[in-house]
Amino acid sequence: MANLIVIMGDSGAGKTYSIKSLDPAQVSIISCKKNRLPFAGNYTVRKVVDTVDQNGQPVFAYDQIKMLLRSSQKKIFVIDDSTFLLKNEQQRNIGLKIKNDKVNGFMQYEVLSFHFKDLIDFILDELPEDIFVILMHHITKDETGKVKTEVVGKVLDSLIEKSCDVVLLAEVENGEHYFLTESCSYATTKSPEGMFPPRIANSLKTVIEGYKKYYGME
């Protein structure tokens, strides 16, 4: 069972920038949208998009991610930005509906739910326990104004938060970037009691080290 951590936040809040604290030799960055990082360094970014192989058969982003997670020797993986896995597949399904009218609205969300949940289950059930997978994810607000992970449709509501023990919110205030770590009325953030202070530096290194120390993994 791998260790799944979610970093959620708006664009520009510092989700991706927090990678800079990690040693490039120890982290594998899987990008669902961007080709480059917002900082210099010898980091390798593997972009995944739906494509076709040389025989014209579809090769989906989800399958590429699983292959990278399974085959790499790295222990830390960042999937940035996992929101686009949902949005890109939604656009593909809309295209299918336009072409053949076989993908109705509810079925579209059922498919989205299945593929995203299947990826989370793969991370939690099939990867070794010394692996860390960090999902960088955009945010939205529910009907009460509470900040939560952005999903497509209602089928996936709260799935991400329910699937892991650590959900942090990236925020910026007066030019300072930081993570909120504890459950509150403002957002669906959470972490085990005593793992982190309520507010910590915008640093994946700090997050992973705190996690390891809490569970005696060092």
Where in this protein do the model-derived segments appear?
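Short, well-ordered beta-strand core segments
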Residues: 27-29, 133, 167-169
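Structured loop/turn residues at beta-strand edges in well-structured enzyme cores
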Residues: 72, 129, 162
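Low-complexity, flexible helical/coil segments
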Residues: 41-47, 65-72, 112-118, 167-173, ...
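Conserved GTP-binding G-domain of TRAFAC-class P-loop NTPases and closely related GTPase folds
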Residues: 142-218
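Residues that form or immediately flank small-molecule/cofactor binding pockets and catalytic motifs
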Residues: 34, 50-53, 138, 172, ...
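Conserved P-loop
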Residues: 1-72, 76-79, 83-88
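Solvent-exposed polar/charged
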Residues: 20-21, 125, 162
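P-loop NTPase motor core
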Residues: 81-159
